[in-house]
Structures are given as C-alpha cells and as structure tokens.
UniProtKB/Swiss-Prot annotation:
The gene is pyrH. Keywords: Allosteric enzyme, ATP-binding, Cytoplasm, Kinase, Nucleotide-binding, Pyrimidine biosynthesis, Transferase. This is Uridylate kinase. GO terms for cellular component: cytosol. The keyword Disulfide bond does not apply. The lineage of its organism: Bacteria, Pseudomonadati, Pseudomonadota, Gammaproteobacteria, Alteromonadales. It catalyses: UMP + ATP = UDP + ADP.
Length: 241
C-alpha cells in the first residue's frame, strides 16, 4: 500500500540500457523482458504520468569495442545509433501491443521507419498522454545514450531522469564485486564527483548538474520498482543539488 498516493513526478525521462532488454539471453532482445517493461510503463501512463524513453543499444552493438579493433569511431557510433532505433522499434511495438499509444522519434532521419525528432511535437505528444521514445542518441558520434537521456530530459522539461540499471541504486563500490559496498539513498552532484561514483559518463552527468536535472538510479529488472520510484517510495538513489 502506497504511503504517498500522489505521484512524486509528473513528467519523466526513462533511460533504459540496451543490456536491460537482453534478460538472461546475453544478446539481442528478450520478448518477455520487453513486454514486462511495456506493462510497467503502461501503469505510469494510467497514473497520468508523461513518459519519455531513451534506450541504449549495447545489447545489439557496441561501437567502442570495434573502434579499439581499428574501426573508425564515427562509423561505430553511427552503427550504435541504429541499434538504439532497432530497440526503439521493439519497444514501440511492445507498447502498442499493451494498448499504449507510443511514438518513436529518431535523431537521424529514417523516412518510413519512424518520425524525425521534433522538440515541439514531442512535448505536444507527451501532454496528450502518448509515450515518446527517443532513438539514435543525440544524432552525433562521441555522445553516449546517457548524454542523450539527459539532453532529452532537459529539452522536454522532465522532472527527473530515471536511469534503469541492473543494480538498485548507487553504491560506494561495485556491489557485485564488493560485499562491503554501501548503498546511498540520496546524493548531491558534488558528492558524486568527490567520491568518483560511477553514475553515468561525466559529460552526461555534468549536463544534468548544470541544468539542475535530478537523476534517479534504480533497478529496472526488479518488478514494481518503476512504480515505487514514481510514487516516491524511496526506491533507488536520487542525485540532486
């Protein structure tokens, strides 16, 4: 039973890693994970929350690895952007199957596949209760999907960027490797930088800090966690001023 019946946020930007879509498959997209995420997003829409989504592409392609093997980094990043479009198409389809109205906007024009990114239209769609999925990152190489999430979050004036990961918040060390790792419930931007905690890459993090965009890190693989985050029930770690 929720102790706080009113949602803590009105408009959110949900950042999902491509890896989150893999489930236990190790590669590609696990349909059952996709459908569960679509259902969790549907719950938010039914609460009246406006939802923007940015998905990574790491389950299908990673530009960095090939860049180290000699591929041009720009080419690798373009391939990574296209991987996020593939994930976006899968997510849009899953949402439609869950009877949720969703639009896919790409930072790279892909006529006939999805809409071009348009800021004013995105906000209009969010206000009308549509889920808007932002694909192809920022449209520029050398920018991570974390940067894209913060950029789109700032552009659509979201209340928070929710970063869905494999762990249930920010820890003092990697909880998978260090049993002594301590979870933080709340941090300031300065504390994250001082403690050199890995929340997201530095350019994305400083963009959020400079625009006072709160970041909330939570475990997307934990059923019901997304709803608890939205209801302000102390799920995950929040980072703000």
């Amino acid at each position: 039973m929720s102790t706080n019946p009113k949602p803590a946020f009105r408009r959110i930007l949900l950042k999902l890693s491509g890896e989150a879509l893999m489930g236990s498959e190790g590669f590609g997209i696990d349909p059952s994970v996709l459908d569960r995420m679509a259902q969790e997003i549907k719950e938010l829409v039914e609460l009246g929350i406006q939802v923007g989504v940015v998905i990574g592409g790491g389950n299908l392609f990673r530009g960095e690895g090939l860049a180290k093997a000699g591929m041009n980094r720009v080419v690798g990043d373009h391939m990574g952007m296209l991987a996020t479009v593939m994930n976006g198409l899968a997510m849009r389809d899953a949402l439609h199957r869950a009877y949720v109205n969703a639009r896919l906007m790409s930072a790279i024009p892909l006529k006939g596949v999805c809409d071009d990114y348009n800021w004013a239209e995105a906000i209009s769609l969010l206000k009308s209760g549509r889920v808007v999925i932002f694909a192809a990152g920022t449209g520029n190489p050398f920018c991570t999907t974390d940067s894209a999430a913060c950029l789109r979050g700032i552009e659509i004036e979201a209340d928070v960027v929710l970063k869905g990961t494999k762990v249930d918040g920010v820890y003092s060390a990697d909880p998978m490797k260090d049993p002594e790792a301590v979870k933080y419930d709340e941090l300031s931007y300065a504390e994250v930088l001082d403690k050199e905690l890995k929340v997201m890459d530095l350019s994305a993090f400083t963009m959020a800090r400079d625009h006072d965009m709160p970041i909330l890190v939570f475990n997307m693989n934990k059923p019901g966690a997304l709803r608890r985050v939205i209801m302000g029930e102390g799920e995950g770690t929040i980072i703000k001023k």
